[in-house]
Regions:
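Short, catalytically relevant binding-site loops at active-site mouths
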Residues: 32-33, 60-64, 77-79
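Glycine-rich phosphate/nucleotide-binding loop
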Residues: 67-71, 76-148
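Glycine-rich phosphate/diphosphate-binding loop of Rossmann-like nucleotide-binding domains
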Residues: 2-57
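Flexible, glycine/charged-enriched surface loops at secondary-structure junctions
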Residues: 16-24, 51-61, 102-111, 126-132
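Alpha-helical scaffold segments in soluble metabolic enzymes
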Residues: 4-15, 42, 46, 83, ...
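Single conserved hydrophobic/aromatic residue that forms the stacking wall/gate
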Residues: 147-155
Length: 156
C-alpha cells in the first residue's frame, strides 16, 4: 500500500513541481532500515528494491526541512505528524509573541523584526497552505480546512 502511495506522490511531485526523479523518504522511528513497525519495515524493503529514488527512512525531526522531496507514511501517522507540527508552530509563534511583549526593549526589537517574521510565518498558515491533494482516487480531490476562502482553496 505505501509503495503505491510513494509512486503516486513522486509522480505528483514531478508533474506539479517539475522535480526530475523526486527523492522519496519513508517516515519511521529511526533512520535504520530495521526500525519501524512491520508495515514500515516491509515498505522499506520494497522501496529499496524499486527503481524509485529512495532515500531511506526519515524521522519526525526531519519533516521540516525535509531531506527529500516526498515523505510517505500511512494516513494515521501522517495526520499525527501534521497535527504535531501545527501545534509546535503555534507554540513557538505564541512564545515569540509573549517574549516580544515583555518590556519596551523587546517590543522595539519586535517592531524591527516583524516585517521580516510575518511573511515567513504566514507561509505556514491555513490561508496559505490550506490543504493537500488526496492521491489514489479516480478524480481530483483536495483535503483542506473547512473555513478556507476560495483563493486559498484554488492554491491547493
Amino acid at each position: 500500500m505505501l509503495v503505491q502511495f510513494a509512486q503516486l506522490a513522486a509522480a505528483f511531485a514531478g508533474a506539479r513541481f517539475g522535480i526530475d526523479r523526486p527523492s522519496v523518504g519513508l517516515l519511521s522511528i529511526g533512520e535504520e532500515s530495521s526500525k519501524g513497525n512491520p508495515l514500515v519495515k516491509e515498505t522499506h524493503e520494497l522501496l529499496a528494491a524499486s527503481d524509485m529514488n529512495f532515500f531511506g527512512n526519515v524521522e519526525g525531526r526531519d519533516l521540516i526541512p525535509a531531506p527529500v522531496d516526498v515523505i510517505v507514511t500511512d494516513g494515521f501517522t501522517g495526520n499525527v505528524a501534521l497535527k504535531t507540527l501545527e501545534g509546535a508552530f503555534k507554540f513557538v509563534f505564541n512564545t515569540v509573541l509573549k517574549v516580544i511583549d515583555t518590556n519596551d526593549e523587546t517590543r522595539a526589537a519586535g517592531q524591527a523584526l516583524f516585517p521580516y517574521l510575518i511573511p515567513e510565518a504566514t507561509l505556514l498558515t491555513p490561508e496559505h497552505q490550506g490543504g493537500a491533494m488526496l492521491l489514489g482516487l479516480n478524480g481530483i480531490c483536495a483535503v483542506s480546512y473547512t473555513h478556507l476562502t476560495l483563493p486559498t482553496i484554488y492554491s491547493v
